[in-house]
Every structure is written in C-alpha cells, then in structure tokens.
C-alpha cells in the first residue's frame, strides 16, 4: 500500500502528465489555426524608395489608389479568387501606381509581384495577424526600396479589417481575440522554424 507521501507524488505526476498533454494539444491547435489563417489570407506589401517625406507620401498615395482598385475590381468570394485575380493583374497594379506617382510629378520604376514572404505580427483595426509566412501582392517603388514598408490585408477585409472575415471560428478567434499567450506561442514557434527568404510566385 502506498504511503501518503508516495500517493501525493503519484498524484502530482499524473497531474503534470495531464497538464502536459493538454498543453501540447492546445499548442498544436494554435499552430494548425495559424497555418490555416495564412492559407486563407492575401496580404499587401508596399516598399517605399526612401524615408523622405516625399517618398513616404507617395507610398501612401499609391496605397490609396491600389485599395480603390481592389475595392472596385477584386473578387472577394474567396482567397483563391483574390489571389488568382492579383496574379493576373500585376501589370494593372503597376500601371495604377505609376499613374498615381505621375500625378505627383514623380517618375520612378514600379514593380509588382506576388510573393510568399515572412511577416511580423501586425495589428489592424479590430484585430491582429500573427507572425508567419503569407502570400502577398508586393509593390516596389523606386530602385532603393530603403523606406518604411506598409502592410495590410487584401483578403479578407480589403485592408479595412480582417476581423470576422474568415471561414472558421478558430481563425476569427485568433485574429480578433486579445493579444495573449496564443499569439506569443505562434510567434515563438515561427521565430524558430519559419524561413525568412522571400519566394516570388508571379511577376
């Protein structure tokens, strides 16, 4: 028969194993949701030429023009539709950006491409997206591309807010919930495992 001390040690061991099992299950569910989130999201990445007031203002003007284009023409039924439309309209993105810059008296190269790239955690109105690799439409303005970047969500939400726009409750919960341990865990794991190299998919 087990002594009281041995019984206490056994109960503590069983409790530890139970908590470890629950923690592993929770961690796996967060990683699975984060992976699904990345698969259901199309992002926008605009790189300015420099940090000068002129170039940063130009970047924001291009942003507004691109958002107007996507609001008007981009299908929003699914991420797959949005991605296919973006890949087919990269020249249109470039033309829109060049016309916007020309209206400001700026003549500089613009390159649009579809990439898979690593994003840090970003906060948006009503929610946030965890760090990880996402597909994105990227616009490079100029040749130096040394200025501050601008990120947002093209689908879902068209850069307004991603909150509530996903198919599953778990995805919406991860995006729209409070920035707590679950985000920290996803960030920590992606920091260890996610490659940082950009992969050009089109353009």
Question: Which ranges hold each PLM region?
Answer:
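Structured segments of extracytoplasmic/periplasmic soluble domains
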Residues: 49, 65-76, 92, 96-107, ...
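Early exported N-terminus immediately downstream of N-terminal targeting peptides
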Residues: 40-87
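Aromatic-capped interface at the extracytoplasmic side
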Residues: 24-37
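Short, Lys/Arg-rich N-terminal segment immediately upstream of the first membrane anchor
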Residues: 1-6
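C-terminal partner/receptor-binding element of secreted or periplasmic proteins
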Residues: 169-203
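Hydrophobic membrane-insertion alpha-helices, especially the h-region
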Residues: 8-25
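Soluble extracytoplasmic domains of inner/organellar membrane proteins
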Residues: 127-181
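Mid-length scaffold segments of soluble, non-membrane domains
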Residues: 80-147
């Amino acid at each position: 028969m087990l002594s009281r001390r041995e019984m206490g040690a056994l109960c503590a061991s069983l409790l530890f194993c139970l908590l470890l099992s629950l923690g592993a299950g929770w961690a796996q569910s967060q990683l699975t949701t984060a992976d699904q989130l990345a698969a259901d999201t199309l992002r926008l990445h605009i790189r300015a030429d420099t940090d000068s007031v002129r170039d940063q203002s130009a970047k924001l003007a291009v942003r507004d023009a691109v958002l107007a284009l996507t609001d008007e023409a981009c299908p929003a039924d699914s991420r797959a539709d949005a991605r296919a439309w973006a890949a087919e309209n990269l020249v249109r993105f470039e033309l829109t950006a060049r016309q916007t810059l020309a209206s400001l008296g700026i003549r500089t190269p613009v390159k649009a491409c579809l990439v898979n790239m690593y994003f840090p955690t970003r906060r948006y109105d009503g929610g946030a997206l965890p760090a990880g690799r996402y597909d994105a439409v990227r616009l490079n303005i100029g040749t130096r591309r040394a200025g501050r970047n601008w990120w947002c969500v093209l689908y879902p939400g068209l850069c307004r807010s991603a909150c509530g726009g996903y198919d599953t409750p778990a995805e919406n919960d991860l995006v729209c919930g409070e920035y707590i341990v679950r985000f920290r865990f996803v960030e920590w794991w992606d920091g260890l495992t996610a490659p940082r190299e950009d992969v050009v998919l089109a353009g």
